Each structure stands twice: as structure tokens, then as C-alpha cells.
Amino acid sequence: MATVPEPTSEMMSYYYSDNENDLFFEADGPRKMKCCFQDLNNSSLKDEGIQLHISHQLQNKSLRHFVSVVVALEKLKKISLPCSQPLQDDDLKNVFCCIFEEEPIVCEVYDDDAFVCDAPLQSLDCKFRDKNQKSLVLYNSYELRALHLNGSSVNQQAVFRMSFLQGDENSNKIPVALCIKEKNLYLSCVMKDGKPTLQLEMLDPRVYPKKKMEKRFVFNKTEVKKILEFESSQFPNWYISTSKAEAMPVFLGNTKGGQDITDFTMEFSS
């Protein structure tokens, strides 16, 4: 990256004239005169060639004017030019390396997995039923079951807190974490006996949920016409599933249709 020093008032007053086209300067001081340089050590007064013009007046000139002056002076110090040839833009290109100092550009590389968005974590409280209208109920503290509820038994239905996690905004799959509210029991996917298995884990409410959850807690939610599916992020193509039979455990399955139900409806809970 090229850097140019800021012009001081003394330099500005020394180098600039009132006429914008007078970007010519003499080497002998602040008197207004014109001088032609045939050689760095041998100058003579002529009416052609590169000329320097000095002015006492301080003007609010742009950086472009100042750079033009500096470039011209550096050119005169290092290179002699025939008076018969006017100074061209191409003549200044070779001088830039003498005036500008290159600085390295340091690019910091970030790990996408370590980056966490500053936006607050969003969540909602809800209840789920499978497409056969079976509700999800917490059974024996650490097991979810799906069964039909009637009358007062409806209160047994588990209330979930669904937290929306950081993920790919361009994907139609929304990463979420599912927690049984007031129990801090999170649905997670682990490998047991060589098979992906759904289980409940109790987590510290002071730490969880967080924007970047461990992969076993992440489910990719898809929704089509208010029908939801929850695919395990840890085990792709494995879904939260229920059996068509009554009061069976909720499990992780990789079969859509048949005896496995992977479609759910959701209702908000106050």
C-alpha cells in the first residue's frame, strides 16, 4: 500500500502558485522565476524544458497537486531530461518507487466454526404432535413418548423451547436446538451400539442454549405447509421419529413413511 505524507504549511506556502496550471518550481528559493535544467549539476536559464515556479502564497490545494510537486522534484533530483522534451506522465512512473513506500497488507484468516454472530439468540415455546395427532410426553424423567391425550391428560404434553442457532442463511434448513422447558433436558443424537440414537441430556441453564451448540444438539428444521421435519445435524438423513403404535418412545429413524412418522405439527405455547 502506498503512503504519502501530509503537506505542512511551510511546504504548501513554498511550493504552490495561484495558477493551477503552474506546477513548475525553481530550485533556488522563494523568488518567482523560471529555470530550465539540462543536468542536475549544470542548470541554465532557458524558456523550454522542465521549469520550477515558486510562490509565497498558501492555498488550499488538493493532494493531487502536492503529489505532482513532489514527483516533479524527485524526478529532477535523480534524472536529467532534455529541454526539448516536455515532462510526460510516463516519465513519472519510474519515479513512483522512489517516492512511495510499499507496506505489506496483513489479512487475518478466521475460522468459520469459531465465529459467533452478535445477534441475540431467538427462541420460542411450543408443543408438537405427529401427523397422527399423538402428543410428545416426558416419561420416566429421561424418555419421550408419543401418545394420544384426552381431557385433563392434555396437560401432560411436553412444552419445548426451540432455539434458533447460527447457520447458513441460504439454506432452507434452519438449525435449531430442542429443550424440554423447565427441565433443561435437550434432545441430542449420539451413537450407541453402532446406531444413531436419540436421547435427553440435562445441561446447565447458565451456559445453554448458546449460539454455537455442539453438533449432537443441532437439528435442521424444514417446514412445508406447516408440516415440520427435524433432521439430525450429527447424522444426516436421520430424523426425529415416532411409531404408529401407541405410547412408544420417540426415536431417531432413517425411514420416511411405513411405520416411522417424521412429520410434525407445532402449536405455540404461552
Swiss-Prot record:
The keyword Metal-binding does not apply. GO terms for molecular function: cytokine activity; integrin binding; interleukin-1 receptor binding. InterPro entries: IL-1_CS, IL-1_fam, IL-1_propep, IL1/FGF. CDD domains: beta-trefoil_IL1B (cd23296). Residues 1-118 form a propeptide. One of its GO terms (cellular component) is extracellular space. Its main location: cytoplasm. Keywords: Cytokine, Cytoplasm, Inflammatory response, Lysosome, Mitogen, Pyrogen, Secreted. IL1B production occurs in 2 steps, each being controlled by different stimuli. First, inflammatory signals, such as LPS, stimulate the synthesis and promote the accumulation of cytosolic stores of pro-IL1B (priming). Then additional signals are required for inflammasome assembly, leading to CASP1 activation, pro-IL1B processing and eventually secretion of the active cytokine. IL1B processing and secretion are temporarily associated. Monomer. In its precursor form, weakly interacts with full-length MEFV; the mature cytokine does not interact at all. Interacts with integrins ITGAV:ITGBV and ITGA5:ITGB1; integrin-binding is required for IL1B signaling. Interacts with cargo receptor TMED10; the interaction is direct and is required for the secretion of IL1B mature form. Interacts with HSP90AB1; the interaction facilitates cargo translocation into the ERGIC. Interacts with HSP90B1; the interaction facilitates cargo translocation into the ERGIC. This is Interleukin-1 beta. The lineage of its organism: Eukaryota, Metazoa, Chordata, Craniata, Vertebrata. The gene is IL1B.
